[in-house]
């Protein structure tokens, strides 16, 4: 009998039921930005002040940056430490959807903004001190952290770092404006809640294997990171 070189994934033998349930959840809620009629928001957009338009553009620019990093670096960083082949399949799904999220913001821009406005948004995003600091803090962990640290960085990004940017479009939705833009944000939030929960769960599995002293030291590192990110958000 020849030696096994590569193993086929068997979805009939599940090592962790959370892998299967997460896969099913993510595939059930699959969506694409092209299905949302963003042009229906043009009347609302024209009624916003220039300051409001500038705010919305910069908020979405920042969110695009985070989704780009997560799709290019974040998922790859935690892929090396998967426990099951099904976990890797889930991460493949997450990585693709992060690219969908990043692309959806460009769909919003192309619908609401002029070419020069879009260029200005990305110029600001790629050079803003605090956005770039946020990206550097997270990406440094992706490049140099251990397996648990990478999962913490990913979970923090998937949760509160994204959610601070979601406030603005949801605020306008609450005022009956930009409903279709907000629909995209709601779909992204639905995805991110699953992404953050899943990666956080995988973190807990590894964290529970640490000694009590190791857990205490890790908690200290984790809260230091949280406060560092929070301080940057305040700026």
Segments predicted by a language model, with ranges:
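Non-heme di-metal
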Residues: 1-235
